[in-house]
Amino acid sequence: MFENKPDDSPVYLATASHDQTIRLWQARTGRCYFSFRYPDLHVNRLELTPEKGKLVAACNPHIRLFDLRSYNPHIPVRNFVSHTKNVMAVGFQYTGHMMYSGSEDGSVKIWDLRVRECQREFRSVSPVNTVVLHPNQTELISGDQNGNIRVWDLRADLCSCELVPEVGTPIRSLTVMWDGTMVVAANDRGTCYVWRSLCERQTMTEFEPLHKLQAHNSHILKCLLSPGNNRYLATASSDKTVKIWNLDGFKLEKVLTGHERWVWDCDFSMDGEYLVTASSDTTARLWSMRAGKEEMVYQAHRKATVCCTLLRD
């Protein structure tokens, strides 16, 4: 069950698979230093909390928090129970006190980690596939199965803006530029819609259409803007590839090939120099952004690897 004690190796990469295991790896060496089974869970998303050593798994239908530095890291230290269907998105405010989640039950929920309870709830008409927090820390942006993108104002407790790029085409993934100036939405037709985000301190955020990018000919399962000054957009697709787009003109910079099945998830390193991906071919892979080449293959899962997250220290 455990391949090593978690104390002697910091967490660099976490992956979850349909084989009902969560694995933790050293990103540089490719060594899986421990794993644990979760036979009663279906994990859709993994996130490391702002508090070091803790991992959150968005499951069906609950959210579970694991303390990776405890003597029993496989036993959840907290269970967040309120959603009634698959939890598809989870994330945190930078202070670490507030957690947000989005679910196929059509809700976006706000949790206070100090009291373990759902504090607020926003309702969407259809299943929620993706939720991101704007860098201003006061707005959540959600995308749903009917193609709606909604901005939820946490100060006013209301939907302040709604965008519908393609009626009826599911929004699969959302990403926001680190400085809040750009928002990208990816859908099931392989299209990315890009807006310039106009932020005013005293008013709500406004969105100005900037670009429409036909990135793939099939589902985009994850889109992600790079951190810092690296101006790239990564799109992971059911066509087995990950494409890297230069934001200056939205030109195709690189195509990362090597996965043999759908690529479900991706995550940039903190400096934007590397990208990790998760695929139905059971592997996770590490890529160099400069070379556009595969640096490492993480292979131990027996079924599809559906989500991955890199430690941001």
Swiss-Prot record:
Disruption phenotype: No visible phenotype under normal growth conditions. WD repeats lie at residues 1-35, 38-76, 82-121, 123-162, 166-205, 215-255, 258-297. Disulfide bonds: none annotated. Keywords: Repeat, WD repeat. GO terms for cellular component: TORC1 complex; TORC2 complex. Probable non-functional protein. Belongs to the WD repeat LST8 family. The existence of a second LST8 copy gene is specific to Arabidopsis and could be the result of a recent duplication. The expression of this duplicated gene (At2g22040) could not be detected experimentally. Could be a non-functional gene. This is Non-functional target of rapamycin complex subunit LST8-2. It comes from Arabidopsis thaliana (Mouse-ear cress).
